[in-house]
Design a protein with these regions (language model features):
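Charged structural interfaces that engage phosphate-rich ligands
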Residues: 1-21
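Transmembrane helical core of 7TM receptor-like proteins
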Residues: 20-342
Length: 342
């Protein structure tokens, strides 16, 4: 009996020591993870160079196209309306949205290490999600503006003056940058146990949570709730607004009036469809739990490949915007003409 008790005591002490060593190892590894490795797209060197060239071109086109939209709205006094003031926020947002990820991705195409610091990873995570969240709020604000303009055209100048439109944009920026603070903080506090390889080209919550050496069901549930509430609430608001717009447009007697209203809203709906279709596949569909699967390429699609086309969508289907861009290019060419009189 004495020997059996001693044996049990030894087993208990051994288990306690093993448990203590395990958590000590977790703590040490957690403190030693100072950087992450972004696996990105593990192609051959030739394909990496090709990807660098293609994505550099799309990034430059995104910057140029969105800057042209901003300058056109800024310089043309006819575009100083609530609709175009909200529209000018959108390309400014797009510039910073792609800048939060693309430069680092381009550097990794030419790098052999593909590393990003711990703080740099979570800063990228914060700005990427904050810009994306702000974009959903601005898309909702633009839908609300179009709903008022088309459904209540006589009251629109009183209900939505320029100053009120500017004040409406400020909460979109503030809420966008505050919304994901809690999930980002919770993920940053997870122990990573020396596991630092992220199977993605950016710091995304799904791959980061999977690196944790302890289960984090509460953090996963909170992230899922935040994503679902944001996506479905703003999408419901946008679709409801455009349902009212479509009902009002169908009551317009003239075909010309219907065409003008649909052309104004068509560009916005195109951007909404591309953006929400992509983020729903990544964050609320069954593939959202597979970081190595389709979501990495869908993220590439909506964060890198579609932004260059948004300025084209807004300008080609909008007569006022095309005219403002034509005036802007004409002014630039006139100023660059040699021998021009001051």
């Amino acid at each position: 009996m004495f020997c059996k008790a001693n044996s049990n005591m030894e087993i208990c002490h051994s288990f306690a020591a093993l448990k203590t060593n395990k958590y000590t190892h977790v703590e040490n590894c957690s403190s030693s993870v100072s950087k992450f490795i972004l696996l990105g797209f593990p192609y051959t060197w030739e394909i990496q160079i090709l990807c660098f060239s293609v994505f550099s071109g799309t990034y430059i086109l995104t910057l140029i196209g969105n800057l042209c939209i901003i300058c056109a709205v800024r310089c043309d006094h006819q575009l100083q309306t609530p609709m175009y003031i909200l529209l000018a926020n959108f390309p400014f947002l797009e510039i910073w949205f792609v800048t939060s990820t693309v430069p680092n991705m381009l550097a990794n195409f030419l790098s052999e290490t593909n590393t990003i610091s711990f703080s740099g990873c979570f800063l990228q995570f914060y700005f990427f999600f904050s810009m994306g969240t702000t974009e959903t709020f601005f898309l909702s604000a633009m839908a609300f503006d179009r709903c008022l303009a088309i459904c209540r055209p006589l009251h629109y100048p009183t209900v939505m003056p320029v100053q009120r439109c500017i004040r409406m944009g400020a909460p979109c920026w503030a809420c966008g940058f505050l919304y994901f603070l809690l999930p980002i903080y919770l993920i940053s506090q997870l122990p990573f146990c020396c596991l630092n390889k992220i199977d993605h080209f950016l710091c995304d919550p799904g791959p980061l949570i999977k690196l944790s050496c302890v289960p984090a069901p509460v953090t996963e549930i909170i992230c899922a709730i935040y994503n679902s509430v944001l996506i479905f609430s703003t999408l419901f608001f946008i679709t409801s607004s455009y349902a009212l717009v479509i009902r009002a447009v169908l009551r317009v007697p003239s075909a010309e009036g219907q065409q003008k209203a649909f052309s104004t809203c068509g560009s916005h709906l195109s951007v909404v469809s591309l953006f929400y279709g992509s983020i729903m596949v990544v964050y609320v569909s069954p593939t959202a739990g597979d970081p190595a699967g389709i979501q990495k390429y869908v993220t590439l699609f909506y964060s890198v490949l579609t932004p260059p086309f948004n300025p084209l969508i807004y300008s080609l289907r909008n007569k006022e915007m095309k005219e403002a861009l034509r005036k802007l290019f004409k002014t630039v060419r006139f100023r660059q003409r040699p021998g021009r009189n001051p």
